[in-house]
Amino acid sequence: MEIGKKIINIIKLLFDDWQNKAISILIAILMFVAFNFNKIESITTEKEFKIILNDQIALGKIPDFSKIKITIKVNKDDLKYLDLNKIILFIEASSIKIPGSYKLPIKIKNLNSIHIAEYKLSKTNVLLNLDNKVSKLVKIEPKFKLIEKDGKGEYFIAKYNILPENLLVYGPEQELKKINTIQTNVKEFDTRTLFVSDYLEVVPPNPLVMFEKSHVVVNIYLNKKYSNTTIKSPNLIFNNLKNGLEIKDKEKIINSENKMFVKIKTRLSEKQIKAHINNQNISLAFDLADIKTPGIYNIAANIILKENINETEIYDYEPKKIKLEIIESSEIKP
């Protein structure tokens, strides 16, 4: 009987006035939720995401966006311990080994020691265009500018060399097919010394291409500028014409009215230049060794600098080719 009474009392305690008790419990739950909600702080920031690729695969195209907004909810008490740099956004694509287009989810990794109550991303997926990753050696085109403080323009770049001359580049196969040369950033040099050795920064043709090195070494040798001189009606030399053949109207070819000249950069004085011309040290030469029968031929011109004129540089000349009519020599005709 005692046990029965106790059970009845417990039932009365639980179910008597149950409506009021249910309301009290609901109010308690709401108060608990409201209390905890007020302790949650919401932070919105913009972050870049990383793309993890297989070693054999490269991005074939830059994604339409590289940053997304992320909303982070964390307990107010933990807020001071939150380091946003330790919230990592990434796309896991390391298992993909075949080029193509893939829509992949953006994943989140929390490296903070505190608990993050909730994450919310403005975008959850990214479309990636992937290509085969290849490499090749590409020639470097240096860009530099000579600055003279006094503005006299007395110096010029006599020669230079690049180390290395070619650079190994990596990137998507379709992009690397378009790349034959790589340029550097423009760098200015002054004329305080006649030899300059410095670094040039290599410029990526686009963000998809990576370099083995980011810099190359350039060695520049300066010299005083040459004076520019045009030698009109230079000496003409016809070499190796076979016996039994001759040039028709040779005297008309050498006619001073024809467009013939040699432009040189030189440190030589006008008197020295004239002496070289008179001594036929600067000439246009034509090699006729390949001509075996009479006919009309276009022969390429070559420059001959006799006596090794070290301080002379040829930068233009005419003609580049000359048309010759070769006939049988009159000396062997009956």
Curated annotation (Swiss-Prot):
Record's GO cellular component terms: membrane
Topology of the protein relative to the lipid bilayer: Single-pass membrane protein
Superkingdom in the source lineage: Bacteria
Primary localisation category: membrane
Keywords associated with the record: Membrane, Repeat, Transmembrane, Transmembrane helix
Transmembrane portions of the chain: 22-38
InterPro entries: c-di-AMP_regulator, YbbR
Domain YbbR-like, chain residue ranges per copy: 43-128, 138-220
Pfam families with a match to the protein in the record: YbbR
Subcellular location(s) per record: Membrane
Protein's UniProt name: YbbR-like domain-containing protein BB_0009
Taxonomic classification: Bacteria, Pseudomonadati, Spirochaetota, Spirochaetia, Spirochaetales
